Amino acid sequence: MKDAKSAILGHHEAINKQDTEEYLATIKFPFTYQNFNGVALTAETAQDYKDRLEMPWEIIKRTEKEWAYSSLDLLEEVARSESSVVFKVAASRINNSGDTDIAIHAIWIAVKTDGTWGIQFRHNLGKPV
């Protein structure tokens, strides 16, 4: 990706498309996902991710059976360096009827390595309070 914001948008789009290869292409490894309940999972490579971890849409559909896609409601840059940008993300999970099942907040970090940007860390904060 050419910049940090494009990396975030591409990552989000790949999740909505449920496209494994496109999703993995948006990631910089090692990649860590941390959930609101304290679980942290790290994949060292794309193959490691495929072998050991579920794709995000599989996790979402386990708890939200009628999930159709997620809307990106807010993308706010929080901090930046030359090689890393931290974003606050607010998203809504939309069901097959077009209604919002749940709204979440998250922190996504994009990093630049080898001249391209990708997502290296995603923390789902859960429901906003």
Ranges and model annotations:
Residues 16, 80-82, 112:
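Surface-exposed coil/turn segments at beta-strand junctions on protein surfaces, enriched
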Residues 21-75, 83:
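A solvent-exposed, acidic/Ser-Thr-rich amphipathic alpha-helical stretch
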Residues 1-26, 33:
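Short, low-complexity N-terminal intrinsically disordered segments enriched in polar/charged residues
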Residues 38-40, 98, 115:
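Detector for glycine-centered tight turns/loop "hinges" at secondary-structure junctions
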Residues 93-101:
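Short, cysteine-centered beta-strand-loop-beta hairpins and adjacent loop/turn segments enriched
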Residues 71-78, 91-93, 105-111, 124:
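Hydrophobic/aromatic beta-strand elements that line small-molecule binding cavities or substrate pockets
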Residues 32, 88-94:
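Generic short beta-strand segments
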Residues 101-129:
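Short beta-strand edge/turn micro-motifs at domain boundaries
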